[in-house]
Amino acid sequence: MAPVAAPSTSQPAGGKPMNWADEFDEPVVGDAPRIEERDEGNGVKVVIEYRTNPDGKKIKITRRVKRTLVKTKVNHEVAERKTWTKFGQEKGKAAGPHSATTTIGENVVLKMSAGNKTAEPEVDDMDKMRQQLANKRIVCRLCKGDHFTTKCPYKDTLEAIPGAGADTPEGGDGSMTPLAGMDPTNPAVAASAGGKYVPPSMRGGAKGPGEKMGGLGGMSRDDLPTLRVTNLSEDADDDDLRELFMRFGRVVRVYVGRDRETGICKGYAFVSFENREDADRARQKVDGRGYDNLILSCQWSLPRGERP
């Protein structure tokens, strides 16, 4: 078997062997792009670029760039923090956040209200009127029924009676009973039938002029067992005192002395009970008790004639 001869390699005239990669032709690189710049003023710069496209044609690209200086006002403390030297993993890094150690979130706008109080929405006048009409019940002036007076089924009968329905207007609360005080033997009713004026003392079955309007069970305001509470705070109101004293017995009346101009409590109040034993027990428990960071004083209220 004949030996296989080694492939022959061509050598240049200098005697140095040639690499096989040198046999391929090097790609022809086109002309390098030529760039021209000129300034047109007002911050406008024109950049002209001459280059060769893939088809071998020379093209001209013109760009106009306008530079505008935008000034932004930042907080002095924020600008000062940007000049701090970085430390830790960011030590030696350039200014500004780095994506490897810093995550930038969305900007949250914080709106501070004056006094941390939310402004209550203003209610329209029409809405106020609708609310008032929604809670108002229609009451007939004649029979006190839940219908208009013009549609009353007893209109022909009750209109013949003088004074019927004169006490409660249409749309009132209807708390009075029908035909209250319409006794024909009453002199006030007989006088009103003739179109004469009837004084308040003679209305509603009153016995005569000078009669004092009685309170609970015929008792006047001075006859009720009343306590005088002093050293109250400026924020005290009727509901607070009623809640404080109602645990000792039934509270008939609560009066808090207030300033006429400001409406602030003057520091005293009167509480009337139905039962004197309940009032005495409340006096012993409340007198000297701490309430709203103050020590209350609770004593019996003297009648007007016995006050010093």
UniProtKB/Swiss-Prot annotation:
<dbReference type="GO" id="GO:0071541">
    <property type="term" value="C:eukaryotic translation initiation factor 3 complex, eIF3m"/>
</dbReference>
<dbReference type="Pfam" id="PF12353">
    <property type="entry name" value="eIF3g"/>
</dbReference>
<dbReference type="GO" id="GO:0003723">
    <property type="term" value="F:RNA binding"/>
</dbReference>
<keyword id="KW-0597">Phosphoprotein</keyword>
<comment type="subunit">
    <text>Component of the eukaryotic translation initiation factor 3 (eIF-3) complex.</text>
</comment>
<dbReference type="GO" id="GO:0071540">
    <property type="term" value="C:eukaryotic translation initiation factor 3 complex, eIF3e"/>
</dbReference>
<dbReference type="Pfam" id="PF00076">
    <property type="entry name" value="RRM_1"/>
</dbReference>
<comment type="similarity">
    <text>Belongs to the eIF-3 subunit G family.</text>
</comment>
<dbReference type="InterPro" id="IPR034240">
    <property type="entry name" value="eIF3G_RRM"/>
</dbReference>
<feature type="region of interest" description="Disordered">
    <location>
        <begin position="1"/>
        <end position="23"/>
    </location>
</feature>
<dbReference type="GO" id="GO:0001732">
    <property type="term" value="P:formation of cytoplasmic translation initiation complex"/>
</dbReference>
<keyword id="KW-0694">RNA-binding</keyword>
<dbReference type="InterPro" id="IPR035979">
    <property type="entry name" value="RBD_domain_sf"/>
</dbReference>
<dbReference type="InterPro" id="IPR024675">
    <property type="entry name" value="eIF3g_N"/>
</dbReference>
<dbReference type="GO" id="GO:0043614">
    <property type="term" value="C:multi-eIF complex"/>
</dbReference>
<dbReference type="InterPro" id="IPR017334">
    <property type="entry name" value="eIF3_g"/>
</dbReference>
<dbReference type="GO" id="GO:0002188">
    <property type="term" value="P:translation reinitiation"/>
</dbReference>
<dbReference type="InterPro" id="IPR012677">
    <property type="entry name" value="Nucleotide-bd_a/b_plait_sf"/>
</dbReference>
<feature type="domain" description="RRM">
    <location>
        <begin position="225"/>
        <end position="303"/>
    </location>
</feature>
<dbReference type="InterPro" id="IPR000504">
    <property type="entry name" value="RRM_dom"/>
</dbReference>
<keyword id="KW-0963">Cytoplasm</keyword>
<protein>
    <recommendedName>
        <fullName>Eukaryotic translation initiation factor 3 subunit G</fullName>
    </recommendedName>
</protein>
<dbReference type="GO" id="GO:0033290">
    <property type="term" value="C:eukaryotic 48S preinitiation complex"/>
</dbReference>
<dbReference type="GO" id="GO:0006415">
    <property type="term" value="P:translational termination"/>
</dbReference>
<dbReference type="GO" id="GO:0016282">
    <property type="term" value="C:eukaryotic 43S preinitiation complex"/>
</dbReference>
<dbReference type="GO" id="GO:0003743">
    <property type="term" value="F:translation initiation factor activity"/>
</dbReference>
<comment type="function">
    <text>RNA-binding component of the eukaryotic translation initiation factor 3 (eIF-3) complex, which is involved in protein synthesis of a specialized repertoire of mRNAs and, together with other initiation factors, stimulates binding of mRNA and methionyl-tRNAi to the 40S ribosome. The eIF-3 complex specifically targets and initiates translation of a subset of mRNAs involved in cell proliferation. This subunit can bind 18S rRNA.</text>
</comment>
<keyword id="KW-0648">Protein biosynthesis</keyword>
<keyword id="KW-0396">Initiation factor</keyword>
